[in-house]
Amino acid sequence: MSKRPNITKMLSDLVAKRLTAQNNYWAAEVNFDKNMQQNRRVDFVGFKPLTPDYVVAPTSVELGCFTCYEVKSCIEDYNSGNGLTFYGDKNYLVCTNELANELKNNLIAWPHNLSGVLCPTKNWKQLRLKIDLSGFQVYRIRPASEMLWAICQSHDYDRNGIYQYSEAEK
């Protein structure tokens, strides 16, 4: 039995924990260009509005920060051609320490717009930046309204309006 689904679930749970702890608006499995040939799905997308001095202004949404996370559990998953879609202002690959070391040691070309690689701590309690690739500023190419709408469409609410993260349930 492969450990891959279990590793993917544990990494996904850590991303959900991180997004919740950072008070982001977020959703898992966010689709862009749905029902089109170039349909792409991002594992997690988080949004934090810009609120200088804790004041919400009309520009808080457009100037806010979108963060995309792609979860990869093994080298086969990384090379599968699925995912590695980064549309955010910050974009992270989330993987095990072993996979991060393998990618770094084999001089794999990093995906365009990647900000860094996050890996779990030894006790799998949180994610830490293992490889920092933020040498230049990345700007999203999609408008905030489209990104927020994609997050809204991907939310999984129960009948009481409470968000249910489906990966944690499985």
Where are the regions that the model predicts?
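Catalytic cores of nucleic-acid endonucleases
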Residues: 60-120
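Non-catalytic C-terminal interaction segments of nucleic acid-processing enzymes
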Residues: 2-28, 32-39, 105-170
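Short, flexible loop/turn elements at secondary-structure junctions
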Residues: 30-32, 48, 72-75
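Active-site beta-strand-loop-beta-strand hairpin of nuclease catalytic cores
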Residues: 39-68, 85-86
